[in-house]
Amino acid sequence: MSVTLHTSLGDIKVEIFCDSVPLASENFLALCASNYYNNTIFHRNIKGFMIQGGDPTNTGRGGESIWKKQFKDEFPSHLKHNTRGILSMANSGPDTNGSQFFITYGKHRSLNKVYTVFGKIIAGIEVLDLMEKVPVDDKDLPLNEIILKSVTIHANPIANQ
């Protein structure tokens, strides 16, 4: 199962791990299908670490899950922050997942069992390279907006349930 994130810097194709992390996958796919992420910005960009988006208020403080409440973390042992291009749920503590997500710029073992991994980049890693080079202010907000214009779902197993 995959989706393409159509950003202002180009397209990133991401494999979604539906079987391994069903809650995070269902939430992300349903939000994508409802155009929830359309025209949102990546509001946090830390070179060497990650880029974060998924907040419809574009402040870094908003967003909610499809269930209108926070949902539990999922930590299968085989999914780790072990390379560049890992897609994970952002949270503010245990079991506080909503709509925000981030993509890693490198391997970060300290994130394992803290943030739910639910996907990885399978095409368009060069777009992630461009994102990492965008200058930021003192709050890690990109000085030139990086916009998630839309998302294309290539196959949605949840739609058939």
UniProtKB/Swiss-Prot annotation:
Q: What is its EC number?
A: 5.2.1.8
User: Which reaction(s) are listed as its catalytic activity?
Assistant: [protein]-peptidylproline (omega=180) = [protein]-peptidylproline (omega=0)
Where is the chain membrane-spanning? none
Q: Output the Gene Ontology cellular-component terms.
A: catalytic step 2 spliceosome
List the InterPro entries.
Answer: Cyclophilin-like_dom_sf, Cyclophilin-type_PPIase, Cyclophilin-type_PPIase_CS, Cyclophilin-type_PPIase_dom, Cyclophilin_A-like
| PROSITE patterns listed in its UniProt record | CSA_PPIASE_1, CSA_PPIASE_2
Keyword Transmembrane helix in record = no
Which segments constitute the PPIase cyclophilin-type domain? Answer: 1-153
Q: Name one GO molecular function term.
A: peptidyl-prolyl cis-trans isomerase activity
Question: Which key words tag this protein in UniProt?
Answer: Isomerase, Rotamase
Q: Is rRNA-binding among this UniProt entry's keywords?
A: no
BP-aspect Gene Ontology terms: protein folding
> Which family would the database say this protein is a member of?
Belongs to the cyclophilin-type PPIase family. PPIL3 subfamily.
Q: What does this protein do?
A: PPIases accelerate the folding of proteins. It catalyzes the cis-trans isomerization of proline imidic peptide bonds in oligopeptides.
Name this protein carries in UniProt: Peptidyl-prolyl cis-trans isomerase-like 3
User: Coding gene?
Assistant: ppil3
